[in-house]
């Protein structure tokens, strides 16, 4: 397979991932599937727009560039005859690096969100992040904490500390975990294109010379 054809496959894979990441980020603005009355009730990491900006908007640009590489002929790229195939592959490296940065940003935001937990209505009728500010551990009985992990990721009994929205911990973990995994996949795909682009820029694509009819498709 030519470098351009392989890049097109990567671009096709990035598009649905970017759409899913945007969708997950939008759903996070509705904790537990509910419309909140105060924006302060939304988990802070949601406002960093990791899925919308990092894995969404920034990922569209490299995806479109990867898709266009297959259509570049051997004499030029994007209709410009002064621009060769190797320059097109070199340009894709820059956009692939941009994709890695965007996916990395989304990955870091998602990892922090999973670690900190959601904002919810605590048992003392205050909206807070009980798993991050230590509030939940004040409710934890001594003997219970001795024999059960105090990290909410491992001790599901702590999830009951969140009264509202209903099922917010599951909602939070599911969506941010999806963003975590998908952003990691995006970063890997873009990193692969960096290598593919280097090969294409140094060695050239596998298509024939300008005007050749026996080049690879």
Identify the function of each model-found stretch.
Residues 2-129, 179-203, 207:
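Signature of small four-pass
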Residues 41-42, 136, 217:
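Low-complexity, compositionally biased segments
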Residues 114-166:
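Extracellular/lumenal N-termini and interhelical loops of multi-pass eukaryotic membrane proteins
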Residues 154-184:
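Individual transmembrane alpha-helix segments
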Residues 209-217:
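Non-transmembrane, juxtamembrane loop and terminal tail segments
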């Amino acid at each position: 397979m030519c470098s351009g054809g392989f890049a097109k496959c990567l671009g096709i894979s990035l598009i649905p991932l970017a759409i899913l990441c945007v969708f997950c980020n939008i759903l996070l603005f509705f904790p537990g599937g509910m419309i909140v009355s105060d924006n302060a009730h939304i988990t802070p990491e949601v406002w960093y727009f990791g899925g919308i900006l990092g894995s969404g908007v920034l990922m569209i640009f490299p995806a479109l560039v990867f898709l266009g590489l297959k259509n570049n002929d051997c004499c030029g790229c994007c209709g410009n005859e002064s621009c060769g195939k190797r320059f097109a592959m070199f340009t894709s490296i820059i956009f692939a690096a941009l994709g890695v940065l965007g996916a990395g940003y989304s990955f870091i935001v998602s990892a922090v969100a999973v670690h900190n937990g959601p904002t919810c209505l605590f048992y003392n009728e205050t909206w807070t992040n009980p798993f991050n500010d230590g509030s939940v551990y004040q409710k934890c009985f001594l003997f219970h904490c001795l024999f059960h992990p105090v990290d909410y990721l491992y001790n599901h009994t702590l999830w009951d500390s969140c009264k509202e929205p209903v099922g917010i911990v599951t909602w939070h973990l599911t969506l941010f975990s999806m963003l975590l995994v998908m952003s990691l996949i995006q970063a890997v795909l873009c990193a692969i294109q960096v290598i593919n682009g280097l090969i294409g820029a140094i060695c050239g694509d596998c298509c024939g010379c300008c005007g050749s009819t026996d080049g690879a498709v």
